[in-house]
Design a protein with these regions (language model features):
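Phosphate- and other anionic-substrate recognition elements at nucleic-acid/protein interfaces
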Residues: 1-108
């Protein structure tokens, strides 16, 4: 099973692909959007980059880190918006999604 994992973030969004059959890392990267751009352009840019990874790696499932409460409301809003973009890209690609909290990811 091939898993595409996303750690959502508006300025920097972590992304990686693992092959669970042999526990190997297929790819890892950081998706970036420019702070100079408007929010809608930034989200569109992140969406495009996520879709490129989906097309390139053909994952069976997408794992997205669940947004948790942060001190900075602006940061949590951007993170939640990127998570929404990732959920939409997965749904439109007919790929199952699993959501995990940061503590669940660290425990695994």
């Amino acid at each position: 099973m091939r898993v595409l994992a996303i750690d959502p973030g508006l300025t920097r969004c972590g992304i990686g692909v693992i092959e669970s059959s042999n526990m190997s890392m297929v790819g890892v990267g950081v998706l970036k959007s420019s702070v100079e751009d408007s929010i809608e352009l930034r989200l569109m840019d992140i969406d495009s980059q996520i879709r490129e990874w989906i097309t390139l790696h053909n994952p069976d499932v997408i794992a997205i880190e669940r947004v948790f409460s942060q001190q900075n409301l602006r940061t949590v809003m951007g993170t939640a918006q990127v998570a929404g973009v990732a959920l939409l890209a997965a749904a439109q690609s007919n790929i199952k999604v699993v959501m995990h909290t940061p503590s669940e990811v660290k425990a695994a």
